[in-house]
Regions:
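N-terminal Rossmann-like NAD(P)+-binding domain of SDR-like oxidoreductases, especially those catalyzing
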Residues: 1-134, 174, 203, 259-267, ...
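C-terminal substrate-binding subdomain of Rossmann-fold SDR/epimerase-dehydratase oxidoreductases
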Residues: 6, 10, 152-275
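Generic recognition of short, well-ordered alpha-helical segments
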Residues: 20, 41-44, 139, 143, ...
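Residues that scaffold the ATP/ADP-binding catalytic core of kinase and kinase-like folds
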Residues: 83-84, 137-138, 244
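A glycine/serine/threonine-rich, flexible loop-to-helix segment
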Residues: 87-90, 141-149, 210
């Protein structure tokens, strides 16, 4: 596939570069993954997140309009909906109101609204997916599963926020990509599809599983002060994409996590320079 890839290094907010690239490469479909996504950094430097996530998305929307693309797909997050209590079975559907609680969440919510506005105002052919927390190989080591795994492999502490029982829904990156591909090919224009696995785990449960798979002691678990605006729980209702597009996640949680930990064990040369 390498001979079919052209890599262009640039700023997602550079409209001239975006327009030139889409035109020169005769791009017919845009999938917008570009985002600042780490909540812990968003509370330190919110401007960086709003610039990339909102203005960057608008830049790509304008460039896509100018290029006359056939489809613009925007990749978003469950976090735009806010958070859920820990003691409830409630889940977020595509009809749930947007209630972002952090700068990152708000920046992604703003991007979602921009995408819908370009559909309603300009007729740009768009779709949106909102996904739960991803995991899998090649994930940047700032994220919790690769952070815990790489720290454990180096016998370093696994830093857990004081709210260790906060829950996340976990989706393997390949299941996510298969869902995006399906929405691109068969999704209805102007629609949003939630992509979730239904698998929930607390941060402490993640730490315990990583320590189990790496054979490291529980003494590596370390409590650190909580971050501002730390959401309690996210879970998505993926009924719409399952019923309309016949999508199902195909990778089990236990197997997927074990394979992910093994990947980091076997690919130290990839992640060590990034830490």
């Amino acid at each position: 596939i390498e001979d079919r890839i052209v890599f262009v290094h640039g700023d997602v907010c550079d409209r001239e570069l975006a327009e030139t690239t889409l035109r020169d490469q005769a791009v017919d479909v845009v999938v917008n993954f570009a985002a600042e996504s780490h909540n812990s950094l968003a509370v330190v430097d919110p401007t960086r997140f709003f610039r990339t996530n909102v203005l960057g998305t608008q830049t790509m929307l304008d460039a896509s309009r100018a290029a006359g693309v056939e489809r613009f797909h925007h990749v978003s997050t469950c976090e735009v909906y806010g958070d859920l209590p820990l003691d409830t079975e409630e889940v977020f559907s595509e009809e749930s109101p947007y209630r972002p609680r952090t700068p990152y969440n708000a920046s992604k919510a703003g991007a979602d609204h921009a995408v819908r506005a370009y559909f309603e105002t300009f007729g740009l052919p768009v779709t949106i997916t909102n996904c739960s927390n991803n995991y899998g190989p090649f994930q940047f080591p700032e994220k919790v599963i690769p952070l815990f795994t790489t720290n454990a492999l180096d016998d370093l502490p696994l830093p857990m926020y004081a709210s260790t029982q906060n829950k996340r829904e976990w989706l393997h990156v390949l299941d996510h990509c298969e869902a995006i591909d399906l929405v691109l090919r068969e999704g209805r224009l102007g629609e949003t599809y939630n992509v979730g696995s239904g698998v929930e785990a607390t941060i402490e449960e993640i730490a315990d599983l990583v320590l189990l798979h790496t054979g490291k002691p529980e003494s590596l678990k370390t409590i650190v002060p909580d971050r501002p605006g730390h959401d309690r729980r996210y879970v998505l209702d993926a009924t719409k994409i399952r019923d309309e597009l016949d999508w199902e996640p195909s990778r089990g949680w236990d197997e997927g996590l074990a394979e992910t930990v093994a990947w980091y064990e076997e690919n130290r040369a990839w992640w060590e320079p990034l830490k």
